[in-house]
Amino acid sequence: MTIFGICDTITRNEKEVFVLSYKTKNIIVYIAVVIFSILFCYFGNKYTMANYKLLNNQGVDATHPGVITEITNEQDYTYQNGLGGSKISFKCTLKDTGEEIEGTQVVDDYDPVPYRKVTKGDKILLDYDDTNGWQFTEYIRTDALLVLGAIFLIALLFFGRTKGLNTIISLGFTCIAIFAVFIPAVISGQNIYLWSVGICAYTIIMTLLIVNGPNTKTLTSCIGCFGGVVLAGVLTFFMTKILALTGVVDESSYSLTTVNPDHPIDLLAIIFAAIIIGAMGAVMDVAMSLSSSLHELKLKVMSISPKELFKSGMVIGRDMMGTMANTLVLAYIGSSLTVTVLIVIYNSSMTELLNKERIVVEILQALVGSIGILFTIPFTCFVCAMLYRNLKPYDNNVEFDEYAYCQQLAEEKEAREARALAKKQAKEEEARAIKEGKEEANKF
């Protein structure tokens, strides 16, 4: 009987039991991870907020959002040197109180890049002081960002469907963990090294379990990702010592030292956290891509040996090396392009430029992240080769592989029949031996 005949006749109910079992396990683990994530973020926030301190602007009211309802006046002025500007008066409705107020915006030529003049219908932020009254401070830009974010979420749901929804949930927990747990831990002066490692571990496990469920593919991805992140962390820790870094990369670094004098923020630990958190995303991508590819290969070719599976993984990994390393390097360059250009302009010596701490940190981020990716590839391939040796076709509880499942059932059925036949033959041999023994005894 063919393997498809087995699935169609003998083991159809067995297949349904396997599928139901893995779906049930997936749901239980999914709910457990979500509950744990909620508890982790809640109690983590409570703990890290114990010594949380912020520098508040004393004597200044909070910023208020508003909508301009009318432009009442625009007055131009000119300085003796020929430069000038405009003072624009307007009426505005505050969103939080509904109060109708009058405010002003000053657009001055001395500003390097002057703001666009306000118009009716603009959504803005205003501050109030006793001397100048209500003053324009900034345009509200979050509305447009929310629209773009909504498009991103809709695209995730449209293209990813269930996995897209799981991606959104895992991304939400990741952002909450960073902004509600890790950032308060940094500000309150706690051990940034431990918290950054803990957040990375939580993010890796939570993301992979929510997106892929509890299976061998998730396990290999987690192990491979941990390997790459640990290597990146160890390299960063020792390189910050070897390079004699201080952690002061720009003016904002000095500001961090004044936030919590009782529990000073470790600037070197900030660099450590920035590097491993930045590298974690790329390393996780590589580990998951390799694990998924080799998992699919194993399901399609059940007879492939661990050695051949490792070789196939390395072939796939080599194709990923260049693009992922470029992605990481270009991401770091793009995120600090303005500062990099400014530093280049004011430093004529290439030697001095390459030894600026800000540039050194950017190079360190790119190199450590790339090394982490390179190490992740063979490490993940090795883990997959070891753990996929006894892989079951129904181990992947997200997408059931019909052909591989039937092939596995056929092999299991043949093994059961062989064991049953051997057992039957053994019993027959034993019965024959007993019968012959009795016949011999009767002769005497």
Question: Could you describe each region identified by the protein language model?
Answer:
Residues 36, 40, 178, 203, ...:
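Alpha-helical transmembrane segments of multipass membrane proteins
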Residues 150-154, 162-257, 267-278:
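Transmembrane alpha-helical segments that form the functional core of multipass membrane systems
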Residues 237-361, 368:
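Generic detector of multi-pass transmembrane helix bundles and their immediately adjacent loops
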